[in-house]
Design a protein with these regions (language model features):
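Bacterial N-terminal signal peptides
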Residues: 13-23
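A charged, solvent-exposed segment within the mature domains of Sec-exported extracytoplasmic proteins
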Residues: 137-201
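Bacterial N-terminal signal peptides that target proteins for export
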Residues: 3-15
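Acidic, serine/threonine-rich low-complexity disordered tracts
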Residues: 32-147, 192-303
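Membrane-interface motif at the C-terminal end of an N-terminal transmembrane signal
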Residues: 23-29
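Cleavable N-terminal signal peptides
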Residues: 17-18, 29-31
């Protein structure tokens, strides 16, 4: 089988957008207190929409992904950790079972190296790396961001051989927020207060001529129609729509939908009309915390 340059697969279609909205239990400080065990998934005893972003260190989100009649066809994990005084985040996704067999057990690894900005409120990536393993073949992309010179460099390798590199200017007063930076910054209110009816435009790393993601939290009237169609009862939930150009993820509409708890944790995520597969679904399985998260990326070569 010959290796083709990376094209986003259905698993990552869900994860890239889902990273915008995973919002968990927030408080000041750098650690998580004990949480009551009787709360439903997606709700926490205490919630605040902003604070020191380093409070997320040690957190891992576990996600199950299904499509058609294949339940839990793939899994994903998102985590934040500190090592030697530097803060990193990783996203890992891989297919399993029969779907894994069909996709050569495809695996995606993302890693961001962060600087802490704005008095601890925002992360800004100095490096963003992506590695894809399909069977025995690998592709890796590195992005370097220098905000002193306002320059973005990128390098792409296939099986250890460089096949592409380039650079572009970073506009002043703009941050190229990769998916992991967006993940934590959105949770911390960097892009604006989270309210029903609100719209957001988020600058991201340019790819295929696209450098922005559009986000809309539906207003109560819009949400009511969807609640009726899907038999949902909780009016405190949020329904979020993300529009990503359909060419990026090979969908018919480019539309991604998220049902979120009142604490902004996605309960269900849907990629609409993925070509040949129909709708794809992701669900939050659980959240764990561990102050010693220093694993995973070294073993796949993202150092």
């Amino acid at each position: 089988m010959s290796f083709k340059p990376l094209e986003p697969n259905p698993i990552l279609a869900i994860l890239l957008a889902g990273a915008l909205f995973f919002s968990l239990f927030l408080r000041d400080g750098h650690s998580f207190p004990s949480e009551p065990t009787n709360l439903p998934l997606g709700e926490y005893a205490t919630f605040q929409p902003d604070g020191d972003i380093r409070r997320f260190i040690g957190e891992t989100l576990h996600i199950d992904i299904s499509f058609l009649w294949f339940e839990n066809a793939a899994t994903a994990r998102v985590r934040l950790y500190e090592q030697d005084g530097v803060i990193y985040s990783t996203l890992e996704a891989e297919t399993s079972g029969f779907v894994g067999f069909l996709t050569d057990y495809r695996k995606h690894y993302y890693k961001a190296t962060f600087d802490i900005m704005d008095n601890g409120k925002r992360v800004r990536s100095r490096k963003f790396e992506r590695k894809v393993i399909i069977g025995g073949q690998e592709e890796q992309t590195r992005n370097i961001f220098d905000y002193d010179t306002h320059t973005h460099w990128w390098y792409r390798e296939v099986d250890g051989k460089q096949i592409e590199n380039g650079s572009r200017d970073i506009p002043r007063n703009v941050c190229f927020d990769d998916i992991l930076a967006v993940f934590y910054n959105f949770r911390n209110g960097i892009y604006g207060k989270v309210d029903k009816g609100t719209r957001y435009t988020i600058h991201t790393v340019p790819e295929k001529g696209v450098d922005k993601i559009q986000v809309h939290i539906m207003n109560p009237s819009e949400q009511r129609d969807f609640m009726s169609q899907e038999g949902r009862k909780n009016r405190e939930e949020f329904l979020l729509k993300v529009i990503i150009p359909k060419e990026i993820f090979h969908t018919k509409t480019g539309e991604l939908l998220f049902w979120s708890s009142k604490h902004l944790i996605p309960l269900e995520t849907t990629v609409k009309d993925y070509i040949l597969l129909g709708d794809l679904h992701a669900k939050l399985n659980r959240r764990t915390t561990d102050d010693s998260l220093k694993i995973s990326t070294e073993k796949v070569g993202l150092k």
